[in-house]
């Protein structure tokens, strides 16, 4: 075991000393390099950590500086916004603007209301005219219906009388054959027959008279209708002209009012626009400033975030690098420990191997010879050299392995660092997105808060403006009340002064009137009371009358004293007469006292009057100043209003021009839209009809193809079956013929063989006889053997003839068989011909059935086309109604034509009414002409019923022959213009709704695939008298259809059809 291990570890040619020296050299070579690399990495990491720390400090300092600047800018912005809001709070013009806007809105509402009233009046007038037209038409229709009914009653009565007379005539004619021939030969024929004939003549005269009366009544009704129509037309023209004149006057008045209002409104609107522009500029400036602040805040926030992110990144990278350094140090320590352990283990192994080798060598040296010892001694250095080389190789391999591991570790570390960088970048991006979202949310919240604050401030400003406005209104009302009170005071003071002057003059003129002094004092007292009452009232109403309350109380006291004195005097006057001296003394003393009191009162009153005058002068001066200020303000407002009026007038003119242009554009657009809609509907209907026709044609073709294929398949199957049968028969016949031919060929061969034998026998007989030799011998021989020889050839000939007969019989049988076969072939041919005839008959029946199916499909197609045309007419009616509604809306929206000119709507209405009247006059004239023609042809068709008064729901179909022609013959194109006969028919039948609706429309031949669609209309000439006397309605309808079939242009019926 030990030798085996030694051989594995130490191969031959190695030595212990070399191995130990190699391991120590490798350790000395590797340790300094690793140490230098580790020192370099540690130095790099320390530099990075120092740089990161310095960057972090700088970022924190810059963040603090940015935060301080941001706070300062925010404080400045808040201060500026507060100052501007405080400045804007003092603006009290918004209320005036709101009032003006309200006034403008009220004026606009009034204008709209007036326009709506005018449009309602116009609509009512139009409705009245339409009602009048409908009423007149209904009355005329009722009259015509009554006349037609009378005529029908007369006709029915006439027919009853004729039937009665014919029945009476029939009874004597039945009795006449029973009478004798003598009575037949009588010339008189009886008085009853003469009476009957007279009655018939009388009835004929009555019928002619009735027809004349009916024609006369119809003419009279026509004349009355024309007169009424003319009167209605004149009245309508007058009413329309009056209504137009009234509408024009109203429009001119309304336009004047509107122009005045528009001028005022335009001025106010311009002023408001200027104010709004000024305020909008202010608001835009504030918004710009706020936006700048927000942008600055955003920039600062972004810088802060970037600095924080850089700081966090630096911290993270520093931490990671520290961790990586620790890991690298641990790895290096572990690698060093492993290397030392490996070198120690190798040293111990080498030492143990050397010891083992030495012991073995010692043992072998004692046993072996000296030669062997020498040889062992020679081999030992070789072994030692081999082991040294092996150890060196192993050390170099281990160093390479260590280097590879180190490089792999470095690569792994780099890969991990790159992955961590990517992960950090992703995290940074996510955090940036989250921060951006948060920042947007914060910005939105800040904006919403700013908007809420702005709205709150605006509301506060509006509330303050409202309060200021209310206060100013209250102050103005108080000033007006004070002004009124002062005016009243002035008037009362002037009255009082005048009364005092009068009283003074009266006292001067009559100083001696002692008796009248009490009365004068009473008057004075009353005047003073009268003057006091308004003064008291004025003091109560006016806020400045508190100064005069004391004076008025003093005056009241003096007046009460005077009243008491006057009462005492009056009492003394009522006493019995005292002595004259005492009376005189008392009177003189009283007069003196009264004079003194009067003078004192006069002085007091003059002082009061002077004070009142001064106060009034002051008040008047104050109010004059106020009035001047108010006049200035009013002048300014007048100027502003005049400017606003001018601006509003200009704006109104511009707006009017714009409105007219827009109205015209709208009308053009509506007309274009209408035409486009009509074209679109027409194209759509054409496309739908063509598409449906194509689909129907395709379905018909597919059905026809399917039927043809089915018939072909059936015929093919029948042919194949018949061919198979014929082929079988022919094969059987061929087999029989081949058998018979084979038999015939066998018989012919037999015949040929027999003929050859006969010829051979004949030749033998000819060769056996010799000419000229011993004729006797020949004769003898003939005599002897002649009968036998002669008997032998006839026997052979009899046999040949029997065989020939048999062959002839067989040939005859074969010929009979051939004849039979020919007869059978002919029979088979006849059967084939019958089958062909049957096939032809089946084909003909199938074609007839197919034609019937095609005819039914065509009829269904025609019905569908009629339904489509009816849908088209209904759609057209809807379009007409829609167009009428659009025109009504346009008319209701109202155009503003020039002054003095009639509106185009009214002119169009008048033109339409005139055209309608002309059309109705033409219809009436044509009806009268048709009636004259009818009554001219009436006596020849007396026994026939008048078809013009038949209540037929289909106006174009009058007679059965005409019905057949209408159903059978198809017109050349779609007729959508209502003819005059159908219109007259509907008019006479009393169906007023049929005038509006179109007549029944026939199908288009261009869409009909039948071959008869291109034929022109040719009326069938019948010998019947009933069909010969056609009504004029049918003739007019035929004439119109013939004209249409002769090819009137497409545009003509289109314009007629779409002329509304």
Swiss-Prot record:
Keywords: Coiled coil. Residues 536-554, 681-690, 773-785 have a biased composition (Basic and acidic residues). PANTHER family: PROTEIN FAM184B, PROTEIN TAG-278-RELATED. The keyword Coiled coil applies. Pfam families: FAM184. The keyword Coiled coil applies. It comes from the Eukaryota. Residues 51-159, 192-333, 402-502, 584-769, 806-934 form a coiled coil. This is Protein FAM184B. Belongs to the FAM184 family. Residues 1-17, 994-1009, 1018-1030 have a biased composition (Polar residues). InterPro entries: FAM184A/B_N (IPR039478). Residues 1-24, 165-191, 532-566, 681-700, 762-803, 994-1050 are annotated as: Disordered.
């Amino acid at each position: 075991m030990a030798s085996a291990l030694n051989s594995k570890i130490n191969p031959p040619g190695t030595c212990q000393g070399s191995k130990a020296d190699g391991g120590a050299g490798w350790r000395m070579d590797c340790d300094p390099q690793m140490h230098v690399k580790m020192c370099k990495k540690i130095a790099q990491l320390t530099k990075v950590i120092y740089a990161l720390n310095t960057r972090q400090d700088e970022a924190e300092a810059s963040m603090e500086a940015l935060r301080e600047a941001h706070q300062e800018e925010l404080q400045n912005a808040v201060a500026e916004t507060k100052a501007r809001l405080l400045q804007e709070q003092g603006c009290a013009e918004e209320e005036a603007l709101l009032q003006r806007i309200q006034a403008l809105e009220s004026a606009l509402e009034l204008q709209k209301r007036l326009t709506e009233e005018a449009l309602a009046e116009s609509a009512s007038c139009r409705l009245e005219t339409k009602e009048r037209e409908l009423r007149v038409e209904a009355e005329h229709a009722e009259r015509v219906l009554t006349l037609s009914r009378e005529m029908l009653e007369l006709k029915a009565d006439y027919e009853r009388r004729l039937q009665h007379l014919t029945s009476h005539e029939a009874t004597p004619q039945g009795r006449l054959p029973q009478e004798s021939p003598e009575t037949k030969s009588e010339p008189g024929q009886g008085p009853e027959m003469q009476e009957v004939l007279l009655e018939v003549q009388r009835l004929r005269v009555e019928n002619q008279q009735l027809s004349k009366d009916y024609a006369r009544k119809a003419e009279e009704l026509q004349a009355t209708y024309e007169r009424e129509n003319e009167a209605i037309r004149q009245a309508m023209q007058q009413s329309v002209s009056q209504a137009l004149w009234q509408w024009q006057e109203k429009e001119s008045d309304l336009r004047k009012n509107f122009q005045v209002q528009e001028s005022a409104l335009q001025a106010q609107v311009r002023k408001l626009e200027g104010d709004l522009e000024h305020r909008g500029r202010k608001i835009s400036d504030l918004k710009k400033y706020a936006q700048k602040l927000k942008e600055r805040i955003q920039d600062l926030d972004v810088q802060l975030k970037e600095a924080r992110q850089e700081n966090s990144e630096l911290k993270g990278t520093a931490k990671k690098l520290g961790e990586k350094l620790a890991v690298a140090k641990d790895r290096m320590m572990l690698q060093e420990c492993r290397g030392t352990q490996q070198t120690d283990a190798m040293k111990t192994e080498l030492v143990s191997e050397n010891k083992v080798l030495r012991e073995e060598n010692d043992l072998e040296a004692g046993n072996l010879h000296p030669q062997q010892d020498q040889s062992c001694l020679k081999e030992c250095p070789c072994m030692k050299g081999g082991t040294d080389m092996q150890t060196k190789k192993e050390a170099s391999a281990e160093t390479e392995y260590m280097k590879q591991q180190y490089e792999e570790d470095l690569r792994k570390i780099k890969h991990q660092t790159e992955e961590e960088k990517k992960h950090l970048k992703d995290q940074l991006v996510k955090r940036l997105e989250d921060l951006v979202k948060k920042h947007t949310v914060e910005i939105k919240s800040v904006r919403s808060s700013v908007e809420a604050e702005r709205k709150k401030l605006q509301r506060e400003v509006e509330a303050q403006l409202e309060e200021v406005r209310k206060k100013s209104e209250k102050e103005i009302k108080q000033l007006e009340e004070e002004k009124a009170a002062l005016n009243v005071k002035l008037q009362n003071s002037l009255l009082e002064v005048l009364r005092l002057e009068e009283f003074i003059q009266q006292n001067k003129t009559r100083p001696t009137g002692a008796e009248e002094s009490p009365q004068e004092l009473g008057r004075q007292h009353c005047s003073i009371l009268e003057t006091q009452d308004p003064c008291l009232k004025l003091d109560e109403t006016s806020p400045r009358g508190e100064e005069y309350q004391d004076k008025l109380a003093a005056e009241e006291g003096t007046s009460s004293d005077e009243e008491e004195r006057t009462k005492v005097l009056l009492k003394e006057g009522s006493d019995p007469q005292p002595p004259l001296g005492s009376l005189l003394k008392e009177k003189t003393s009283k007069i003196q006292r009264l004079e003194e009191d009067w003078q004192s009162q006069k002085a007091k009153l003059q002082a009061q009057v002077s004070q009142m005058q001064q106060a009034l002068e002051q008040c008047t001066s104050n109010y004059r100043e106020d009035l001047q200020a108010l006049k200035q303000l009013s002048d300014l407002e007048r100027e502003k209003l005049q400017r606003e009026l001018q601006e509003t007038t200009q704006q109104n003119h511009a707006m009017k021009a714009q409105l007219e242009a827009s109205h015209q554009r709208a009308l053009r657009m509506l007309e274009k839209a209408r035409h486009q809609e009509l074209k679109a509907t027409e194209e759509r209907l054409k496309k739908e009809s063509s598409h449906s026709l194509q689909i129907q044609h395709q379905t018909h073709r597919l059905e026809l193809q399917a039927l043809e294929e089915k018939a072909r398949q059936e015929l093919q199957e029948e042919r194949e079956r018949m061919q198979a049968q014929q082929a079988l028969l022919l094969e059987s016949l061929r087999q029989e013929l081949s058998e018979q031919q084979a038999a015939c060929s066998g018989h012919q061969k037999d015949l040929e063989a027999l003929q050859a034998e006969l010829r051979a026998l004949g030749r033998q007989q000819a060769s056996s006889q010799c000419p000229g030799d011993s004729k006797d011998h020949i004769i003898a021989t003939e005599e002897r053997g002649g009968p036998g020889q002669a008997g032998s050839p006839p026997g052979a000939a009899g046999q040949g003839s029997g065989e020939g007969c048999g062959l002839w019989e067989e040939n005859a049988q074969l010929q009979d068989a051939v004849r039979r076969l020919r007869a059978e072939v002919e029979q088979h041919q006849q059967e084939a011909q019958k089958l062909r005839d049957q096939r032809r008959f089946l084909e003909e029946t199938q074609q007839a059935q197919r034609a019937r199916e095609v005819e039914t499909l065509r009829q269904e197609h025609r019905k569908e086309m009629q339904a489509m045309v009816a849908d088209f007419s209904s759609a057209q009616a809807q379009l007409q109604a829609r167009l009428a509604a659009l025109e009504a809306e346009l008319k209701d929206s109202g155009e503003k034509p020039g002054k003095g000119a009639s509106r185009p709507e009214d002119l169009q209405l008048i033109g339409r009414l005139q055209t309608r009247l002309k059309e109705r006059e033409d219809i009436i004239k044509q009806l009268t002409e048709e009636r004259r023609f009818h009554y001219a042809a009436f006596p020849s068709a007396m026994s026939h019923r008048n078809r013009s008064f038949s209540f037929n729901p289909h106006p174009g179909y009058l007679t059965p022959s005409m019905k057949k022609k209408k159903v059978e013959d198809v017109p050349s194109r779609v007729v959508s213009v209502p003819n005059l006969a159908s219109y007259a028919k509907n008019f006479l039948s009393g169906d007023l709704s049929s005038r509006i609706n179109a007549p029944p429309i026939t199908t288009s031949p261009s869409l009909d695939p039948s071959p008869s669609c291109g034929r022109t209309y040719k009326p069938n000439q019948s010998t019947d008298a009933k069909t010969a006397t056609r009504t004029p309605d049918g003739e007019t309808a035929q004439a119109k259809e013939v004209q249409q079939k002769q090819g009137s242009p497409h545009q003509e019926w289109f314009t007629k059809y779409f002329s509304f």
